[in-house]
Amino acid sequence: MIEREPRSSAAAVSTDGAARLRAVRSVMLDLDGCVWFGSELAPRAAEVVAELRARGVGVGFLTNISSGTTSHVADKLTRLGIPARDSDVLMPIEALAGHPLLAGSPQVYVLGREEVATAVARVARTTTDDELADLVVVGRDPELHYADLAAALHVLNRGGPLLALNLDTRVPIEGGRIVPGNGAI
């Protein structure tokens, strides 16, 4: 049995953590509920990102939000105090092109904001006719209408698959509040 001497000071932990951090070349940070809460940065988020960058660690940002674009997300980060470029951000909208459900040019009924429909239209044919749609792509839309839900359900009841851009049922926002996420649909 190997016994280790107990760590008695925070300095020892910090030194050990710093040694481990020196081996890290890049990190990907989740945004919603980690780096930010709605329109508020998490405490010390900007300082942590600045420190990582000062140490030469590449910093990228992941989000599974399906509204907006990488440009919107990078602009929001910058506005909140964390300088970011579009290329620093990965979103599910950008991953659509490689999804097997979109191979073969199906007609897609989009349940989501305009930017989701635009992203889908870059890689597949979109339709607003639930009789013609082969599948449903769903992205978060706080202004979702019941008629759109009913149309999407019709596609699914006819056997069309559902491609959800994320499964989060709730999204943490400023003030400790929670709002329904894409997975709630």
Describe each model-derived feature in a short phrase:
Residues 1-31, 35-185:
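HAD-like aspartate-dependent phosphatase fold
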